Structure formats: C-alpha cells, structure tokens
C-alpha cells in the first residue's frame, strides 16, 4: 500500500494513527491488521458487515465500465474532483473496482478505495499504484483521520453525512452521484430491474444537508447502445442482480434486437465541508 495513503489512516479500534509494519498496519496501542496478498487491508476490526457485491457482480461491473459505457459519469466525476484545490487524498466510498477513483486522481493525489466487498477490493487495489484499498463500512465509521481528505467520491453508494464531514478537510468536497428516476428505464421495464425511488433526491439532501453545504447539482444523460452481453452485465452489476433470474434475463435479451438502447440518467451533486 502506498505510504502516502497509510499516513491518512486511523485504527478502527482506538482511532490512533496507523503505520506500516512489514505486511501489516499497526497503531501504538498494538492493534494490527494484515495486508492481504491481494493488496487490501481489512479494517472492519471483526465487526459484522454486509458481504457486499459478489465476485460475479464485480466482474459484470468491470466489463461494463471498461467498455466505456459510463464514461460520461467518470469524466464528470474526474472534472469535479479536479476543481477542488489540493494535492492530498481522495476517498471513494463504495469504490467497487476503483475505476472512478483512478480516473479522478489526477497527477498529484493519492486515493483510498473503501468497500465491504473483498471481490471489489481485489480489483481496486490494482486499479492504480497510488490507490490503497481497505475493507470498511461507512455506517460503522471510516478508518480515516479527521480532516484528511480533499475529496470524497460517492457513486451509487451508501452515504454518511457525519462521517463525510469528519473526514473532509475544511473546504473539502463530496462528489455524489445518484440515479435519476428515468435511469435505465427501458431495461427496468423490459427486464424487471429495480427502479429508482422518486424520493431519492429528498433522501440524499436529508442525509447530507445537516453536515455539508450543497454547492451544485448537474444532470448527466447519455443514450447507451448495448449488445446483449453488455445489457446483461448492466443488470448483473447492481442491486437488480439480487432480484432477477439470470436465465430469465438472458432469455428476454435473446429476443431483443441489437443494439439495445437504454438511457443513462443520473445526478451529480457536490457538497462542501465548512470546517
């Protein structure tokens, strides 16, 4: 793990600073956390957490993102991060494969990929040499020192207003991407995917506004032209994977002419820490 990332980490047990000690991270109180051979560190400290995305979901997401279908999102996220002054740390919560984080680093920053999925962290740890990957649950507290981050990325991921405010430095910014009600509407109708809660914008504001100040919100929209494999990956990479039958999805897609079109429709909002 990159030394400059470790300097921003804190012990999940006692909140003391972590330092490298061979193939482990340790604090002064003696708490020790092994670095897995795949490059990530489990900092859940034995607490029970959700297992997160399965290996199949991560593979599907990696294929879809690498094909460039969500580049309109990654480009906008990278631009928003680049607009925040500083040459320090970017933290991505729910980082998945680390692709968004790697594209947002720019020339001068290091990144921390946080996820609960071990399958995702194996990918994130390899996404860029400047990225460190840790297993942690945002609801149980991020293993990051106070005021350590220039930017937090949260892309289709859980959020914690109090933790974001604690981890961001004064003037730091959280970049949040959430689906709009029309996101992938064509596939939702055809394949039984999970739809978007119309009240999602209100819930987002309620989760962040007491702790951060909203700076901006911009809509992002693109028409995706997918082959059947990409459409299946789109279903299989997110929450719909838990609610659909892969065989039924494959059968439905077999009867749909290519390219299969779907509308990517999301909102990107930025939230500043007042410090």
Model segments located where?
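Conserved class I S-adenosyl-L-methionine
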Residues: 86-96, 173-205
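Conserved Class I S-adenosyl-L-methionine
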Residues: 6, 218-275
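Conserved SAM-binding loop of SAM-dependent methyltransferases across substrates and taxa
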Residues: 97-108
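N-terminal auxiliary segments of SAM/dcSAM-dependent transferases
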Residues: 1-51
């Amino acid at each position: 793990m990159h030394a400059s990332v470790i300097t921003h980490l804190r012990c999940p047990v006692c909140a003391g600073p972590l330092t490298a000690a061979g193939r482990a991270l340790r604090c002064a109180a003696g708490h020790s956390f092994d670095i897995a051979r795949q490059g990530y560190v489990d900092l859940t400290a034995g607490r029970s957490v959700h297992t997160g995305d399965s290996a199949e979901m991560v593979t599907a997401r990696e294929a879809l993102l690498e094909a460039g279908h969500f580049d309109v999102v990654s480009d906008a996220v990278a631009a928003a991060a680049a607009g925040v002054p500083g040459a320090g740390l970017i933290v991505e919560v729910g980082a998945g494969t680390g692709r968004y984080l790697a594209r947002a680093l720019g020339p001068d920053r290091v990144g921390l990929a946080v996820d609960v999925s071990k399958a995702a962290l194996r990918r994130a740890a390899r996404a860029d040499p400047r990225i460190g990957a840790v297993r942690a649950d945002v609801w149980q507290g991020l293993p990051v020192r106070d005021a350590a981050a220039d930017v937090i990325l949260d892309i289709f991921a859980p959020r914690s207003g109090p933790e974001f405010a604690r981890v961001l430095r004064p003037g730091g910014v959280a970049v949040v991407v959430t689906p709009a009600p029309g996101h992938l509407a064509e596939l939702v109708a055809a394949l039984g995917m999970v739809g978007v809660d119309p009240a999602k914008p209100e819930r987002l504001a309620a989760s962040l506004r007491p702790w951060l100040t909203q700076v901006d919100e911009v809509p992002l929209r693109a028409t995706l032209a997918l082959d059947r494999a990409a459409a299946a990956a789109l279903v299989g990479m997110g929450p719909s994977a838990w609610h659909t039958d892969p065989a039924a999805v494959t059968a439905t897609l077999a009867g749909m002419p290519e390219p299969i079109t779907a509308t990517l429709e999301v909102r990107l909002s930025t939230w500043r820490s007042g410090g």
